[in-house]
Amino acid sequence: MECFIMLGADARTLMRVTLLLLWLKALPSLIDLSQTGSTQYLSSPEVVIPLKVTSRARGAKNSEWLSYSLVFGGRRHVVHMRVKKLLVSTHIPVLTYTEEHTPLSDYPFVPSDCYYHGYVEGALESLVAFSACNGGLQGVLQMNGFSYEIEPIKHSSTFEHLVYTLNNNKTQFPPMLCSLTEKRLLYQPFGVEEAKKSAMKQNYGKLWPHMWFLELAVVVDYGFFTNAQQNLSKVRGDVVLVVNMVDSMYKPLDTYVTLVGIEIWNRGNVLPMENIHQVLEDFSHWKQISLSQVHHDAAHIFIRSSLISVLGIAYIAGICRPPLDCGVENFQGDAWSLFANTVAHELGHTFGMKHDEESCSCGKSGCVMSTFRVPAERFTNCSYSDFMKTTLNQGTCLYNHPRPGAGFLVKRCGNGMVESEEECDCGSVQECEQDPCCFLNCTLRPAAACSFGLCCKDCKFMLLGELCRPKINECDLPEWCNGTSHQCPEDGYVQDGVPCGAGAYCYQKQCNNHDQQCREIFGKGARSASHNCYKEINLQGNRFGHCGTDGTVFLKCRMSDVFCGKVHCENVEDIHHPQAPYVLQNIYANGITCWSTGHCLGMGVPDVGEVKDGTTCGVGKICLHKKCVSLSVLSNACLPETCNRKGVCNNKHHCHCDYGWSPPFCLHRGYGGSIDSGPTSQKRRVIITVLSITVPVLSILICLLIAGLYRIYCKIPSGPKETKASSPG
């Protein structure tokens, strides 16, 4: 039995579904974009070396422009670009969370002079949006109906880059579905139709302003943060890269998109991520309170959730109408330019744009508000009309020019968040009265050194070497306090690819293998099935055996990848472990019973039966993204020899030394740890030192004592004694 997601009570025919979609599209509503598979490329990437050339940019001073020559697709292309203005503040406010889930704001330096926009020489209406912040060119280039992504090759000594051609074939993507109920219609206090009636009375030619300025706040969920290897700097870079592309798409609308703040949920999701409609509603309420310190015209949340089967959702015409000025975008791990399309699309709904109809045209094969998600760069005439109707009627918040560095409001103390120039923040008056470490004015009390953190106890820094984060498994590493900070060092773990368990390898802090996954699903005693089970089932391409999906159908595994698709088990005694909506299948393969779980597309829950990344699939090979790849794809910047074989490499490619050896390379005697873990325990050092002195002394004393007692109590004879015979008397 196959699985179907039904629309309506019967949903018997495709025509009925089609009519329903057309009806939904004609109404103001919440709009969502259905999920697609991973990015499809027309061909393998080409290696190019951008050559800097003398600028011939049209109508501008050469000092303002950079020009590069790139050869790909059999042709030479000259790109002209210049630095963007108003894209991001130099010190953009970034809000994160401590391990106690206390909000913590920072103003890290984010370069604002390395994001570019421009055009391709000789290509009318071309689009270029590049970042050059990391020593190479990364971004999107669109021209002549094709979209290309470019990214630098890491550690290349010759400035090599990869150029990918994105597939513009819209038939690969299912149409967007509009989730509409009468209840959701009533939720919007002021609908698009009323905006239209009011705007139609206006004369657009007279009222069209010179420019619009959208101040955008972006929240990043834990899944998106994890996708960036839990690297805060990478998250910031990814967000700005996407906003740079979105800003370029909105330039024809005379609209600047400025990033005014980022919040990163680096300690777990604040809201449940199971239903995108609920996420949008919860986010709209949450941001009214928790994001109120960030001045913004719109707030969107970037998520990565396998529990959600759509790409995005937003309130129509929510701009300048809090709390409806928000949206959700679900990143699926594909090209950044496609994700930027999703963000631009959902922002379009925020601006009042609906999905394009057949009569709409943008002069390109892909339009931003198309009912199919394809690489796009332009808005249609319909989108322009919707944009004008909404912004001229309610877009007053878009008139003001962004204030550099003014993302957060002035008032900070008392909101429970430790921000710049604050020593602590105990919150309300009542909370501060109970706080032994912090005053109401956000300063520390006398004799208090800290008020929060894993290395703060009783308002004091914990001693140097105190354990603040213990090791939880063989692929994890411990951390210790340094005695001068309230924060525990960043959570570190064993470098990906280091052997663990029985023939397995550490990956992302876990030691995964097929046997363990079988036990997790079917209980104690279950183990991975024979190779025949994997070969027979995972080549079928159904819910019981596959190597991923393209968004609509299950994909058959290649023979080389069969151990990276679905996990198959044997020796199953407890068949009640899997919970709904999973179904079980058992088949016989060469006399062996193979058990596996079936998963239905569109159910909104992860597939527990998919083989986990990092699982061994052959000698020197692991599973990554449903592919069996060589361990060599992982970074080997640190080797056992690097650590003198007296330690293990960590996720930052530094040595974490065994006890008895000291970092950085475990060459000299010491107390273990790494340059990232904090100094190891002082107590342990003292104990070991004392024991090293006292144990030998005690051993000698005990030996002497035993010898003395033995002589006293055993009375060892010294030789025969003479006795005199007595004479008879």
From Swiss-Prot:
Cofactor comment text: Binds 1 zinc ion per subunit.
Name this polypeptide is given: Disintegrin and metalloproteinase domain-containing protein 21
Taxonomic lineage of the native organism: Eukaryota, Metazoa, Chordata, Craniata, Vertebrata
Alphabetized Gene3D superfamilies for the sequence: Collagenase (Catalytic Domain), Disintegrin domain
Domain Disintegrin: 410-496
Segments carrying motif Cysteine switch: 176-183
Keyword RNA-binding set for record: no
Cytoplasmic side: 707-729
Residues that carry a glycan: N169, N231, N381, N441, N482
GO molecular function ontology, one term from the record: metal ion binding
